[in-house]
A protein has these predicted regions:
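Conserved core of the PLP fold type I
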Residues: 2-144, 149, 155-176, 243
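Surface-exposed helix-capping loop/turn segments at secondary-structure junctions
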Residues: 30-34, 234, 254-269
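All-alpha amphipathic helical-bundle segments outside canonical DNA-binding/catalytic cores
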Residues: 36-41, 268-272, 285-287
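Short beta-strand segments
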Residues: 64, 116-119, 149-152, 179, ...
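Conserved glycine-rich beta-strand-loop-beta hairpin in the small C-terminal domain of fold type I
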Residues: 68, 240-251, 263-282
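Feature representing long, continuous alpha-helical segments
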Residues: 96, 100, 135, 202, ...
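Conserved core segment of the aminotransferase class I/II
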Residues: 105, 169-241
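Conserved C-terminal alpha-helix-loop-beta "cap" of PLP-dependent enzymes
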Residues: 201, 205, 277-287
């Protein structure tokens, strides 16, 4: 209540509160972004942000990784938008496969709304796009005049603290960036943001107002006050250490179970560098 209950418990506007802006800018700078605070749109997490984005634009189809976040597929389906999954490798979405899918879709008369990807510690494969891969994907989008939706819930969760430049930092006027505090603060607070190209701000803000009416000013104030007092470094390092330990525990359990069942060599995986996911592949068939 000391944060200002007379204001925080009232209706709000579809703009990020001034108290939350420093917390967002602190995270954004770590992946080479410099958002304009006036363009930031509040969400109740990136899932709602994704639903807002897909409901704001026309199109029949979203192109994404062949294995992708199930919540994204649900959001696209709820908006009546079909998805086309394209081939991925250890660096995530393949640029040549993306270009082929775009050409094929347009040849068949489909209107492609956007490309969707999680470039850092992707769900579910855990892949990380190199800087060269990111540049190549953005070139395909630029060559075909396509928007790209960047979903970035795990970008701060590298086990060794490494970060990569956000796609948004490399092409600010083509990328719609979805951020969330669910993975770096607490999922129960339900707070995130959209950083869209400048020419799409008002359209997305109108959708935000329709879908949420009043983003939680109280939740934004809680996060903003935490950041004002503590910053992000200590909390992020705690999360990284926790997930690093969990990954080691999981890999140890897998190795022990495969040895116990004489299945060593049947399954392979890449050592995760961060995020939540470990992707297993069967030597005979991918699973």
């Amino acid at each position: 209540m000391r944060l200002g209950s007379r204001i925080l418990l009232q209706y709000s506007t579809p703009s990020v509160s001034s108290s939350l802006v420093p917390a967002i800018l602190d995270l954004a700078e770590r992946t080479c972004m410099s958002p304009d605070p006036r363009n930031l749109i509040p969400t109740a997490g990136s899932q709602l942000g994704l639903a807002m984005v897909i409901n704001a634009f026309d199109g029949d189809e979203i192109i994404c990784d062949c294995a992708t976040y199930p919540g994204a597929l649900a959001a696209f389906a709820s908006a009546g938008v079909e998805t086309t999954g394209v081939a991925s490798d250890e660096e995530g979405l393949n640029p040549d496969a993306l270009a082929h899918a775009v050409a094929e879709g347009r040849a068949n008369g489909r209107r492609i709304a956007a490309v969707y990807t999680t470039p850092t510690f992707q769900n579910p494969t855990g892949s990380v796009q190199s800087e060269n891969r990111r540049a190549a994907l953005l070139k395909v989008c630029a060559d075909n005049d396509l928007l790209l939706i960047e979903d970035d819930p795990y970008g701060m969760l590298s086990f060794d603290g490494q970060t990569w430049p956000a796609l948004k930092s490399m092409d600010p006027q083509r990328v719609i960036y979805l951020g969330t505090f669910s993975k770096v603060f607490a999922p129960g607070v339900r707070s995130g943001w959209i950083d869209p190209p400048a020419n799409l701000v008002e359209k997305l803000r109108a959708v935000c107002e329709i879908m949420t009416l009043s983003p939680s000013a109280l939740n934004q104030a809680i996060i903003g006050e935490y950041h004002r007092r503590h910053g992000w470094d200590e909390l992020l390092e705690g999360y990284r250490a926790s997930y690093r330990a969990r990954a080691r525990l999981l890999i140890g359990a897998l190795e022990a179970e495969l040895a116990r069942t004489n299945c060593t060599g049947t399954w392979t995986w890449r050592e995760p560098r961060g995020g939540f996911y470990l992707w297993l592949e069967n030597v005979a068939s991918t699973s």
